[in-house]
Amino acid sequence: MHEKRRERGRTYRVGLILGFCLLIAVNGLFPVSCVYAEEEQTKIAYGENTPGQLYARSAVLMDADSGRILFAKNAETERPMASTTKIMTCILALERADPDESVSVSANAAAQPRVRLGTVEGQKFKLKDLLYSLMLESHNDTAVMLAEHLAGSVEQFADEMNQKARELGLSHTHFVTPNGLDGADDGGSHRTTAEELARIMRYCVMESPKRKEFLEITGVSSYQFSDLEQTQTYSCINHNAFLTMMEGAISGKTGFTGEAGYCYVGALKREKRTFIV
């Protein structure tokens, strides 16, 4: 009897993995690299009761409550992380600044490549509004605006991101940019692993003192705001398709660069359990 229950549970867990893989394959959303998580008591290696082809180059399953890794495929391989970087940018902004602070646009921020909010030097915005721009539309100029506001420069903010990574015990993660554009510095390339990216998301949704605010921002379908001078209104649409496609999805961030490929990290709740996706 107990063996049958365990087998049903295992089938459910593998089914969850298959479900995500099917969504990814059919919809073409994130075919290259993504992070999954779900509750289990024993670690499942890739190839053991898993789909014959898991198209992600790296993937993990994690129990979000305990942080236990339950499924892994190349989970410790260092790779660029594209715009999934912005979950760290967002949580640092929430933890270290007042949401009503005024943020100015520098020439450097305004010159960032697409995708961007489309700001001009000298514009001012409320910090809270920029966090929706960052997480829903993944605007690169917004990430630089926040980095410069919080730390004075992109380079100094990268140092603060790396300090936070060390506090979280992440030894294979290195930040160079606040927006996830590919880059390198004296510490090496902009990179993380599937496991460590999942741990960053776990911190954002489970452990941070600003987790409620993080979930509020990343869980909405759309948001509208204006600059402080009321000269222009901006509309943001959440591009995390899993919020509507997957029951229980509560947060997530997409990403893409030529070097990173397609990336995804997210969180969902099922039957009172929290998973990292």
Regions found by a protein language model. Give the residues of each.
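N-terminal Lys/Arg-rich, disordered targeting/topogenic segments
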Residues: 1-11
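Conserved catalytic neighborhood of penicillin-recognizing serine enzymes
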Residues: 112-145, 233-251
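Short, well-structured active-site flanking segments
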Residues: 95-109, 208-219
